[in-house]
Amino acid sequence: AHSRVVTNDVKTILGEEGLQQYCLEPFLNAESGTTQLDWREGPAESLDKDVVSSCESPFSAEGGLKLLTGNLGRSVIKISAVKPEHRVIKAPAIIFDHQNDLKMRFDAGELEKDFVAVVRFQGPKANGMPELHQLTPVLGLLQDRGFQVALVTDGRMSGASGKVPAAIHLSPEALNQGAILKVQEGDPIELNADKGILHNHAEGFTERAMPPVADRPSVGMGREMFAHFRESVGAAEEGASIF
């Protein structure tokens, strides 16, 4: 409530005093003779700085969200839960056009190695950016087995940060002729969260012709209803808005 970026002029369930009331803590007031519930000023500093730190002593000097750029485009990565030894990886690309494909190849025993999973056609224009939650358990298990793995996708992953480095919201997306569409199996992909780099080191990658995009289903399962939104939606880095 003391922050310069919080609006205090609000009415809450605690009364007319705005958010200031949320800085109070409840306690049993024995001095009243009835041990009634009362309120007092809460602690000014964190009681457990391993959980909540201060501005003067932050967990990270730069925060947990970083921008990655390179010849694949622009993406963001959450590194709060990624150990330093996993923040830099250079490994061959394996291409997936659906998150289920990764699980199938894992079950078939084809992913017991270092690789960068490149998951395409998951952007706002392609399919509305669904949550790619199925990727995390598989990649996390492979990392636990000692393999260097990472994710690059034009899709999204919401929620808490994972332990696997994941370059998400890559723009431009594959359906918008983004560079991710030109990535081929085995291309050496570098993801460097420390330096903010996302780069395909394959020789001649930038000059590669853009491959054709296969026709995607446009009717059935309500697709007709949302066709206008798919056509007009903006890029992920611009908010994926239709306005």
Map each language-model feature to its residues:
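Catalytic or ion-coupling anion/metal-binding cores of large enzyme and transporter domains
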Residues: A1-Q148, V152-E173, G178-F243
